[in-house]
A protein has these predicted regions:
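A conserved beta-strand-to-alpha-helix junction within the catalytic ATP-binding
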Residues: 1, 24-39, 96
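Conserved micro-motifs of the catalytic ATP-binding
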Residues: 20-23, 62-65, 129
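Short helix N-cap motif at coil->helix boundaries in the Bergerat
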Residues: 30, 113-121
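Conserved catalytic submotifs in the C-terminal HATPase_c
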Residues: 46, 51-61, 98-100
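Short beta-strand/loop element within the Bergerat-fold HATPase_c
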Residues: 90-101
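Short alpha-helical Gxxx[C/S/T] motif in the catalytic ATP-binding
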Residues: 137, 141
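Detector for a conserved hydrophobic position within an alpha-helical segment of the HATPase_c
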Residues: 145-146
């Protein structure tokens, strides 16, 4: 039964990757979206002993994009950070969003880091180092950001610090 569940999960993941709808781009408050995600995960942060910080410059950032798709990307990156911090006594996750000529969003954690030999592979569909999950998450995130004419990269990853960087046009 476990194997059939994995096949179903794989099929569902493949369907998501291959049928990603075109983004419905509308003006929305990125700041409000980030605050909603903080609220959504606040119980998980508390339960996992994770300190979460959110900063936006300017205080309110508006952007054009598919709010649902971008929320999914941010939620996936936050959940990955939380998984990286499992068992850590003083976990920290921060999001720093900035608007100037473009929008940049950095999601940072103080987890173990991603080994250099895996940093290119983590965006490949179905690649995973976890016992659970399909390995589709980061690939899907990268594809969604690309559909918004943006880029998702690992800005830095060392033991004690990983930063995922999203760069998008206004």
């Amino acid at each position: 039964q476990a194997q059939s569940e994995r096949v179903l999960q794989f099929t569902e993941s493949f369907r998501h990757l291959s049928y990603l709808p075109k983004p419905e781009k509308k003006l929305f408050s990125l700041t409000a979206t980030l605050q909603n995600l903080r609220e959504l995960l606040s119980g998980d942060f508390k339960e996992s002993n994770i300190i979460f910080t959110l900063t936006c410059e300017p205080k309110t950032i508006y952007m054009k994009g598919d709010e649902n798709q971008l929320s999914q990307v941010l939620l996936n990156l936050l959940k990955n950070s939380m998984q990286a911090l499992e068992g850590k006594e003083k976990g920290r996750i921060s999001i720093h969003a900035q608007q100037d000529e473009h929008i940049s969003i950095d999601i940072a954690d103080n987890g173990p880091g991603i080994p250099p030999e895996l940093q290119e592979k983590i965006f490949i569909p179905f690649f995973t180092t976890k016992s659970e999950g399909s390995g589709i998450g980061l690939s899907l995130c990268k594809q969604i950001i690309r559909l918004h004419d943006g880029h998702l990269t690992i800005q830095e990853s060392n033991p004690g610090k990983t930063i995922f960087h999203i760069d998008m046009p206004l």
